[in-house]
Amino acid sequence: MLKGGAVWALGTMSGTSLDGVDAAMVLTDGERILEFGETRYRAYSEAERAVLRAALGRWPGEAAVAEAAEVVEAAHAELLAAFRGAEIVGFHGQTLAHEPGGRGTHQAGSGERLAQALGVPVVWDFRSADVAAGGQGAPLAPFYHFACARRAGADRPVAFLNLGGVGNLTWVDPRQAAPEAPGACLAFDTGPANAPINDLMQARLGRSHDEGGRLAAEGEVAEAVLARFLDHAFFARMPPKSLDRDAFADLLPAVADLSDADAAATLTAAAAAAVARGAAHFPTPVRQLLVTGGGRHNPVLMAMLEARTGIEVVPVEQAGLDGDMLEAQAFAYLAVRVARGLPTSAPSTTGVPACLGGGRMSRPEALALQP
């Protein structure tokens, strides 16, 4: 059993970019964040990335999925062994397939191997219960955002914007009693963010991303393409809502006839315009968007966001948070919530019918008793 009060929790995140694994420690009781601890990163090798790429979109029972699980578990075991003092681990795994309302969701990697290797309880498979109950299974960081706003002493609603492959917004009111309370959190995906820009750069120029937004800065936005993008049915749906990375697969073909610079400018504007559409759903206005994820390093995107939303847009570091480790910290926090029977999602965050605590826990002592 996990002791009472605050404990040091270690969380991990491996995102859709397949770059590597983030790991971070947080001192928390599952409600408050008392202290931030050590952080580490382990990059995937090219060989490991190739195995993971081969498993994307596949489901358990296929050989590629088993091979991906081996890579994920070994990489995490190596990284997490370097930490000291963790009393519980929140292990997200690597999402390979995610079909809410369809086949479900699957993250490669079992918490059992990590529990045996590390000798502490491991919480994993955070999303399946939410999806099985009718939720989207994402996003799961909003309850942590609520705790971050509380820790920062916020006395009014705050919004967090994550700019990864897909963008997502979290609106929180830290004046509410708890993150699962009615009116405390609203979260949803905004639309494509970095993914189309990165795909364009890779396809046309062999680069992983538009460094500093320099290419977009040289181009002009194709307003007709942008208008067609904003006509997509996704933008008419009310939140909460989630989006697969490839749901807007027609966006790259839409800029095929544009120059490299104009295409980059148009895709960057599309990411900003999608966020502006999303911000219109906030229950009450906010003064700032606190931005996390790789997109915060793109000054052109940040400027477009500010222009289109009319809200001050700042990197989350200005609030004393670590924009590179926020999601890993979130799964450390969520692990303690799971261990203590607290909810990890709500109707206003994933669309699940009622507040729900997801996750499975593997304990090393229980595994040792297995034949």
Curated annotation (Swiss-Prot):
GO biological process per UniProt: 1,6-anhydro-N-acetyl-beta-muramic acid catabolic process; amino sugar metabolic process; peptidoglycan turnover
Gene3D superfamilies: 3.30.420.40
SUPFAM superfamilies named among the record's database cross-references: Actin-like ATPase domain
InterPro entries xref list: Anhydro_N_Ac-Mur_kinase, ATPase_NBD
MF terms (GO), sorted A to Z: ATP binding; kinase activity; phosphotransferase activity, alcohol group as acceptor
EC number: 2.7.1.170
Reactions accelerated catalytically: 1,6-anhydro-N-acetyl-beta-muramate + ATP + H2O = N-acetyl-D-muramate 6-phosphate + ADP + H(+)
Function per UniProt: Catalyzes the specific phosphorylation of 1,6-anhydro-N-acetylmuramic acid (anhMurNAc) with the simultaneous cleavage of the 1,6-anhydro ring, generating MurNAc-6-P. Is required for the utilization of anhMurNAc either imported from the medium or derived from its own cell wall murein, and thus plays a role in cell wall recycling.
NCBIfam families noted in UniProt: PRK09585.1-5 (NF007141)
Protein's name in the database: Anhydro-N-acetylmuramic acid kinase
Gene field: anmK
